């Protein structure tokens, strides 16, 4: 019994230091919250947030729970009300998507979904539909975090499969340039990432995105341009709690 207790204690200690070491290497951690000013079709509209909520267990594996929120303010609400909430659960080691819930409200448009990706069975379950898959999948919102774990080198390209609702699309991700960006949070030297596929867009029926990541240890998404249902959302970093 004493031996079993020692083994159990050792497992706990090793697990603790493993998670600690992993967290030390990452440019973000649980509790990080990035706040953005948001413009819709270049009109000041409201605010958006990216939050690392927790580390949960999904499909018997540890996963980062991250959340994207966007909302218009009182004036913009009268013109085109936006209340978008997307929760994604990303693999703790490689940041591909395990699970996602979406609750989208943009004007009169409404959309909700729950997606569970079962890699062991090579399927994705979206609401009540089952979709065959191959390899690792990334949802568009996971890219805000996945790219932060990589060396962002100008001219570098990467291929991956993007999962959005029931759509699976192969995309080439391109780090196009270095740019200096002025946002409410300050001035940042950034690497610019443009996911694309010729003739296709990153988000089905919505549009493309461009992300400016700070060229420092944190690689924060300083500026984001998203094509949403009926226009363009421009997000600029306002405050950050790392």
Where are these regions (language model features)?
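Sec-dependent N-terminal signal peptides
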Residues: 4-16
